From Swiss-Prot:
This is Protein FdhE homolog. It is found in: Cytoplasm. Necessary for formate dehydrogenase activity. It comes from the Bacteria. Belongs to the FdhE family. GO terms for cellular component: cytosol. Pfam families: FdhE_C, FdhE_central, FdhE_N. The keyword Cytoplasm applies. GO terms for molecular function: ferric iron binding. The keyword Chloroplast does not apply. Keywords: Cytoplasm. GO terms for biological process: protein maturation.
Amino acid sequence: MSHTAEIPLVPGSESPLELKPLKAADPQIVYHRRAHRLLSLAKDSPLADYFELCRRLVSIQAKLAEGADFGQLLAWGKDEATPLSLLGSEADSYWQGLLQQLLSDLLPQVDESIARVVRLLMQQSPEQLSSWGRSLRQGHVSEVPAHFSLFIWAAMGVYWSHWAPMVIKRMDQRKVAQQSMCPVCGCHPVASVIVDQPRAGLRYLHCSLCESEWHYIRAHCTSCGQDKEMTIWSLDDAQAQVRIESCDECHGYTKMMFVENSPSMDVAADDLATLMLDSELNAKGFGATTLNPLLMAHETT
């Protein structure tokens, strides 16, 4: 059972047209939608086997999000800019418990090559898992064995996405400034989403860990913030549902998902399905400033 009664609620506006600086996600809905989208995208993908692995993993996340024991909300930085980034080592036992459940459920669903990785990860010490989890949350992906990152992040995502909505209710959103990293947990975004509510054309960045979304003005670089030298790219036409916004100053880029036109889209699944866009931008000297929880590519800097 979750306990949050000791944290006072912060009053806010009830206007349906007010721009919300920060939006909470329902992890069960997110994971179910993501699993369905992965199944749909796999049909025409050369990465169909990997999409299926991710679908099974995300389906287990949905199951855990619904019925796992998350204990009580631990001490968090309620006066800090990114409150859930400051969870102490006490959180490790909870997400590591989720990791063991996730791996146990996944083990009979995968082939032997992946099963060996799963069994090896299940044998790691709590201290080692804590260290790897901390490195991933800090963006130091290359410090963690690549074959473990996907599963560790998935377990942490279930834990952090469970608590994020409750913490958001208790944050003073008037103090949430435009920023590159998640204002709730401090992690990288997956991509931008362009929505039609409460007003058409608003952009939000979607967190790779806690699944929260925060407003970010369009035509501004989501990494360095400049707004003078920005370029939009797409594979087919200017109205593509997935486009890339690149910065000529810092040479970073982020994808934009126009979910207002295609509600079935999911940031992680559709990012994975459009890796050809990444290849094109990488060849031009640009680098992603985002992180996909289904890919966990090692940083290049």
